[in-house]
Amino acid sequence: MYAVVKTGGKQYKVAAGEKLKVEQIPADVGAEITLDQVLAVGAGDQLKVGAPLVSGAAVKATVISHGRHDKVHIFKMRRRKHYQKRQGHRQNYTELRIDSIVA
């Protein structure tokens, strides 16, 4: 069984037992959270698609850790104008373990 959930403005296809890195969620490590924005639920050849959400569906997950992704380097330059700008960015994330899918 799998589900498509929306969190942090992004969509993820998840199944029970998987680990997933999502945008940072303000929850303690070890806390159980419920992702209730379920867009679709599937099992085998059956697929239930919401309009826009599947009613009564939820995904239960446990927070494993919080962290930061690798640095992304941004470099801007204007040729012949002696303008250069360097910048770096590290995005925060929360790692989840998907416990169960309730459909």
From Swiss-Prot:
InterPro entries: bL21-like (IPR028909), bL21-like_sf (IPR036164), Ribosomal_bL21 (IPR001787), Ribosomal_bL21_CS (IPR018258)
GO cellular component, one term: cytoplasm
Signal peptide: none
Example of a GO biological process term: translation
Keywords noted in UniProt: Ribonucleoprotein, Ribosomal protein, RNA-binding, rRNA-binding
Pfam families: Ribosomal_L21p
A GO term, aspect molecular function: rRNA binding
SS bond partners: none
Family according to the record: Belongs to the bacterial ribosomal protein bL21 family.
Subunit details: Part of the 50S ribosomal subunit. Contacts protein L20.
Protein's job: This protein binds to 23S rRNA in the presence of protein L20.
PANTHER family reported in the protein's UniProt record: 50S RIBOSOMAL PROTEIN L21, LARGE RIBOSOMAL SUBUNIT PROTEIN BL21M
Protein name: Large ribosomal subunit protein bL21
Species of the source: Ralstonia pickettii (strain 12J)
